Amino acid sequence: MVQQGFSIDLILARNREEAPDGKDSVSSRPHIPCAPQPLAPTKYAKEIPRRKDGQEQGEITSFQCSSEEARNRQFSNPSLPALHRSSGSSDEFSPAGSEDDGTESSGRNSQENDTEHRSKSPKSDLQRRLRTAFTPQQITRLEQAFNKQRYLGASERKKLATSLQLSEIQVKTWFQNRRMKLKRQIQDQQHSMVPPPVCYPQTFSYYPGGFPVPLNSGSFYQPPAHPFQAPQHSFIPQPLHHHMRMSAHQEQFPPLFGAQYM
């Protein structure tokens, strides 16, 4: 048997011979570092400081060289298309570009919503603001019908609408508004007819002891009794002269009348 050497030169020579056939192993291929992942979008992505023209051109040329080397490696190694696709997509879609697209799409949506709202709002406003202008002849006829009957039936409403050249809905709304107006007028009249409350001064009656006792207003005025109910006797203070007679009669007897005959 022929002894084969295991030196590095022999191994590399074998790999070079096997490379054109396309049957080289993964272990013999050179190591390619992974591309860095793109940064998350931030508000400072748009504010990238500019450098001088010479530096920018140098960076562009170095980037082109690195991209060409990566393409050559891609053809030699078919297991790297996903890596290059991810790096290419990260180069094409920058964070600043994604933010710009998001703001533009949101602005377009808001503008479309505003235009739709404006296109719909004038129609609704016109429908709400449309009010029928009744002629004096129509108003007099409607007032006469309202004085006769405040609630119209379907047949009567139809006849009145055809005679006045109006729709049934217009006649119905007019009668509703007229009933509300009459209700407000009645409420105003009731408030005006109620007299304001009168506050009477508080009176006092002086008894022999010299202490004033207030008299309630109920002692001067009593409501009439119900015919089917017995009148309730309210407390009425006795007149002053009655108390004076009682006090004079009591003073005729001495305080120690029984003690003299003991």
Curated annotation (Swiss-Prot):
Protein name, entry field: Homeobox protein vent1
One Pfam short name: Homeodomain
Domain notes: The N-terminal region is required for repressor function.
Keyword Metal-binding found: no
GO BP field: BMP signaling pathway; determination of ventral identity; mesoderm formation; negative regulation of DNA-templated transcription; negative regulation of transcription by RNA polymerase II
Compositional bias per record (Basic and acidic residues), positions renumbered to this chain: 16-26, 44-55, 114-128
GO CC terms, sorted: nucleus
